[in-house]
């Protein structure tokens, strides 16, 4: 039986994850026409997890989520996604591509929000168990450049809570992701997301060829 493969995409706001996941999905379907390719996002995926996503992404005037509430909501979404979506797909031998996963929780709620990293890892472990990525593609871009992209692609009123954080928050996010990549070099591949779209895509394909036996 074909072994499933789990790839996650990480990075700061405006790094181009959505575009690159779409391009990778198209490339995999072309090269592996008989292989199931499953694409989803975190938070989100199954219907219940999508409802949690709406709470996390939409501002609540006068009652902003405290960091621990964010952490627990992300964990609830991940638990639902792992059991309803990712684990069954991997058992079927699918290639699973997810836009953000637990690394984002550790970086956003830990490095940027200031929660204890060990507490975050314990919560993530409870939520996800043995479901862990085989490869994480970290799309790295300077925060000011990524935020400029988000302003270009969407009106100011369409930005979510994380887009509108201060620049210092996004700088902490980038630092957190790069530290995570340094600590996990076998799993995390750093991609230069400041390059043009096709160059970024080729970097991703090369990282997959080097680290996984699927292409």
Predicted regions and their residues:
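NTP-dependent small-molecule kinase module
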Residues: 2, 23-27, 144-215
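Hydrophobic anchor at the beta1->P-loop junction of P-loop NTPases
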Residues: 9
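A glycine- and Lys/Arg-enriched "phosphate-lid" helix/loop adjacent to the NTP-binding pocket
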Residues: 105-175
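Walker A (P-loop) ATP-phosphate-binding motif of ABC ATPase nucleotide-binding domains
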Residues: 6
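Conserved lysine of the Walker
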Residues: 17
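ATP-dependent small-molecule kinase phosphotransfer cores
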Residues: 31-128, 203
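Hydrophobic positions on the alpha1 helix immediately C-terminal to the Walker A/P-loop
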Residues: 20
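P-loop (Walker A) phosphate-binding loop of NTP-binding proteins
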Residues: 12
């Amino acid at each position: 039986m074909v072994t499933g493969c789990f790839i996650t995409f990480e990075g700061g706001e405006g790094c181009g994850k959505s575009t690159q996941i779409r391009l990778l999905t198209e490339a995999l379907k072309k090269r592996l026409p008989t292989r199931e390719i499953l694409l989803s996002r975190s938070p989100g995926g199954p219907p219940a997890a999508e409802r949690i996503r709406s709470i996390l992404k939409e501002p609540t005037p006068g009652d902003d989520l405290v960091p621990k509430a964010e952490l627990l909501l992300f964990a609830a979404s991940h638990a639902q996604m792992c059991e309803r979506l990712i684990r069954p797909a991997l058992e079927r031998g699918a290639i699973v591509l997810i836009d953000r996963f637990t690394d984002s929780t550790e970086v956003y709620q830990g490095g940027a929000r200031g929660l204890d990293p060990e507490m975050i890892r314990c919560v993530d472990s409870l939520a996800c168990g043995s479901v862990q990525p085989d490869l994480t593609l970290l799309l790295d871009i300077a925060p000011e450049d990524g935020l400029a992209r988000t302003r270009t692609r969407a009106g100011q009123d369409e930005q979510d809570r994380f887009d509108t954080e201060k620049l210092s928050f996004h700088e902490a996010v980038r630092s957190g992701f790069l530290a995570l990549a340094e600590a996990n070099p076998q799993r995390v591949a750093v991609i230069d997301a400041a390059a043009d779209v096709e160059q970024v895509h080729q970097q991703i394909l090369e990282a997959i060829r080097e680290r996984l036996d699927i292409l």
